């Protein structure tokens, strides 16, 4: 059963905006679990978190941390009220992840495979981050980028 909690509990959050590939969502849930995050909020336009492929990719992480479907705008307001800084992911108007020092509390918003994070959500962040790419590839898969950023922000 999906958690009903609407309270902000915990210090580290992953917010997922309109990610459509079940393998990506499942991998991000599993990665958030592995990185020790407190909760995952899955926004509108994202694939069903109980899709068979999501469950397979998550490898049981649904049982380890709260995964809540919700309105990301409302959740961002709640997180801000609890002094949790919100970081977005973007290619424009963003700073390298290396310009941010690790923090003990944060929320990270990651976005749709083709469109990225919704512009309205990006305007609500304290900073938008990008991952430097040193090779010839133009981008990273959203679940891979999520893992890199979560572990970077969580490092001691």
PLM-predicted stretches and their roles:
Residues 1, 5-93:
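RNA substrate-binding interface of SAM-dependent RNA methyltransferases
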Residues 34-35, 49, 53-61, 119-156:
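Structured adenosyl-cofactor binding patch, chiefly the S-adenosyl-L-methionine
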Residues 88-137, 141:
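Active-site/ligand-binding-proximal alpha/beta "capping" segment
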């Amino acid at each position: 059963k999906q958690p009903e909690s609407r309270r902000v509990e915990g210090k580290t959050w992953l917010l997922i905006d309109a990610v459509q590939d079940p393998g990506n969502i499942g991998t991000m849930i599993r990665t958030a679990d592995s990185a020790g995050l407190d909760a995952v909020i899955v926004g509108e336009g994202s694939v069903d978190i109980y899709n068979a492929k999501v469950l397979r990719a998550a490898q049981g992480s649904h049982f380890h941390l709260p995964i809540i479907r919700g309105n990301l705008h409302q959740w961002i307001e709640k997180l801000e009220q609890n002094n949790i800084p919100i970081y977005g992911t973007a290619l424009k108007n963003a700073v390298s992840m290396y310009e941010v020092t690790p923090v003990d509390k944060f929320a990270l918003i990651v976005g749709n495979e083709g469109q990225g994070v919704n512009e309205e959500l990006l305007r609500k962040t304290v900073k938008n981050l990008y991952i430097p790419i040193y090779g010839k590839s133009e981008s990273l898969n959203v679940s891979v980028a999520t893992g890199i950023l979560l572990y970077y922000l969580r490092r001691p």
